[in-house]
A protein has these predicted regions:
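A cross-kingdom feature that marks ATP-driven nucleic-acid transaction machinery
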Residues: 1-116
């Protein structure tokens, strides 16, 4: 079911944890980002994972959103990219579809997570 994109909410969390494990196994330190909106009393932006190139001279970050379904929104990723434009080295969405690149965002199937 993971590969077919037929996951429930709880299984979606499982999917995200599998991706986290793959990133850690590849040697990455994992970071995340949330922004709390005081007026709405909720998080209005959340990035699942942020990787870093650890360069002292040209430090860049790489936000990653994990999507377990075929239909999804990347509003948080788009807003994050706008807010931190100077620091972004590349943006990724890990999803159940094929590899593609649209508007500067690389969309990777889950099995290609090791490429990051």
């Amino acid at each position: 079911e993971i590969l077919l994109g037929k996951l429930s909410v709880n299984e979606g969390m499982f999917y995200e944890n599998v991706i986290a494990q793959m990133l850690v196994a590849a040697g990455h330190k994992l970071y995340f980002y949330t922004r709390y909106n005081q007026e709405k009393h909720r998080n209005d932006m959340e990035i699942d994972f942020i990787l870093s190139n650890h360069s002292k001279l040209r430090y860049k970050i790489f936000p990653i959103e994990v999507k377990s379904n075929d239909k999804y929104s990347i509003r948080s990723l788009t807003r994050f990219n706008e807010s931190f434009r100077q620091r972004i080295g590349g943006s990724y969405v890990i999803h159940p579809k094929n590899l593609s690149v649209k508007e500067g965002v690389v969309y990777l199937p889950a099995y290609m997570t090791f490429c990051l």
